Amino acid sequence: MPDSALPPCSILLLAGGRGQRMGGRDKGLIEWQGLPLIAHLHRLVRPLTDDLIVSCNRNQERYAAYADRLVSDDSRDFPGPLAGIRAGLAVARHPWLLVLPCDAPRIDRALLETLLQAAGRTPARPWMLRCGGQWEPLFSLIPTHLAEEIEHAWRQGDRSPRHVLLPLGAEAIELAAGDPRLANLNTPELLANHRELK
């Protein structure tokens, strides 16, 4: 059950990419420390929501074990993470959608709670992590009432989550450059380098 002290949110785990840096392998299903990457995220976020969504474009039968429901891009050409965010916003049951990439297993509960607590301060605006001054839109918290504005930007041809969220008044949770919790393990080398880290 979700923590009642935090605002109710749906959570979207993005696992819909082509995995180009992994030689075409499905990143969310690659093992790290004995479990698929998606399993690490599932274990972390499951207590925070009763509406866990996974965006995936293949291996749906395997991802189903880690989600309350699955969504897929409405285009078959892997149009990028904003497509998954749109799909998540379309089905989210709560006022907020917490967005996370499937290949960041080192993010921790404390950071997610900081992001969720920020929601109470400006309920009309999206929040993103900003690491060393760099916006990280795939670690974001989006009010679901902004779905139509995001859809409008998509129809205008914008495919960048950062470009779409910033004009909506996005706020930042500031982190130091190189914060290891945001490490995307999206190449074989990064997976190997982080394999022994807890």
From Swiss-Prot:
Gene Ontology process terms (BP): bis(molybdopterin guanine dinucleotide)molybdenum biosynthetic process
Cofactor(s) essential for the protein: Mg(2+)
CC per GO annotation: cytoplasm
Keyword GTP-binding: yes
Binding site for Mg(2+): D103
Superkingdom per UniProt: Bacteria
Record-linked InterPro entries: MobA-like_NTP_Trfase, Molybde_CF_guanTrfase, Nucleotide-diphossugar_trans
Signal peptide, first to last residue: none
Catalyzed reaction equations: Mo-molybdopterin + GTP + H(+) = Mo-molybdopterin guanine dinucleotide + diphosphate
Positions of disulphide bridges: none
Binding site residues for GTP: L14, A15, G16, K27, D73, D103
Top class in the EC scheme: transferase
One function term, GO molecular function aspect: molybdenum cofactor guanylyltransferase activity
Keyword check for Magnesium: yes
Xref: Gene3D superfamilies: Spore Coat Polysaccharide Biosynthesis Protein SpsA, Chain A
Primary site of residence: cytoplasm
Complexes and interactors: Monomer.
NCBIfam families: molyb_mobA
Record remark: domains: The N-terminal domain determines nucleotide recognition and specific binding, while the C-terminal domain determines the specific binding to the target protein.
Similarity annotation: Belongs to the MobA family.
Official protein name in the record: Molybdenum cofactor guanylyltransferase
High-level lineage: Bacteria, Pseudomonadati, Pseudomonadota, Gammaproteobacteria, Pseudomonadales
Gene that encodes the chain: mobA
